[in-house]
Amino acid sequence: QTAIDRCMIELDGTPDKHVLGGNAIYSVSVAAYRAAAASTGLPLYDYIAGPGGVRTVPIPSFNVLNGGNNNGIRQAFNEFLVMPYRASDIEQAVEIAVKVFQELGNVIREYTGAAPMVGGSYGWCAPSEDPEVCLDLIARAIANCGYTNQCAFALDCASSEMYEAGKGYYLNGRHLTSRELIAYAKGLTE
């Protein structure tokens, strides 16, 4: 497997994989994995896990706020996620996410004065068009639960959904260039 992957990367010869393309390199790698698994009679997941099997599960991310158009609010970012990256195991990660999600409902109620609505992806509907306000509300819910040092944020910006031909990327009531959107997103991390 490693030899095939290395060969594909060397054939491409570019740091960003633009000659063969990441999709082609990935597809060949997966095909090699599938062929190797089939030759041993193992399901793909068992073959990839190796002789010792899977001993850990990645800590998941949890969608807590949904963007889109809800209740007259146009939140451009698609999803706001909580990542309990310091959870000791999957059970604790789920427990943290559930508590934060429930508390976020209370925080949204305090912010808006109304019961929060559930969005199409089963997170709460974003109560503000401003992503910074949404992140602040999530941070408040995390702090209220005592998990400030155990959680991080993630965003599904879905920038293709924000793009309006000839205008740019719609965010916070105005249109941004791609450079401005990147600078804005970078600013959210600081």
Role assignments for model-derived ranges:
Residues T2-R6, P43-N63, A152-C157:
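Beta-strand segments within the central parallel beta-sheet cores of soluble alpha/beta enzyme folds
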Residues Q1-C7, P15-A24, Y47, N70-R74, ...:
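Short, flexible active-site-proximal loops enriched in glycine and acidic residues
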Residues Q1-L42, V94, G123:
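Metal- or metallocofactor-binding catalytic centers and their adjacent structured scaffolds
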Residues S29, I48, N63-N66, M83, ...:
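Short beta-strand segments
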Residues I9-H18, G22-Y26, N63-N69, C157-E161, ...:
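Cofactor-binding beta-sheet edge motifs in enzyme active sites
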Residues G52-G67, E95-N106:
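Conserved alpha/beta core surface patches that mediate binding of polyanionic ligands
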Residues N71-E190:
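Metal-dependent enolase-superfamily TIM-barrel catalytic cores that perform enediolate-based chemistry
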Residues A38-Y47, I142-Y147:
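Active-site phosphate-binding and catalytic loops of NTP-dependent enzymes
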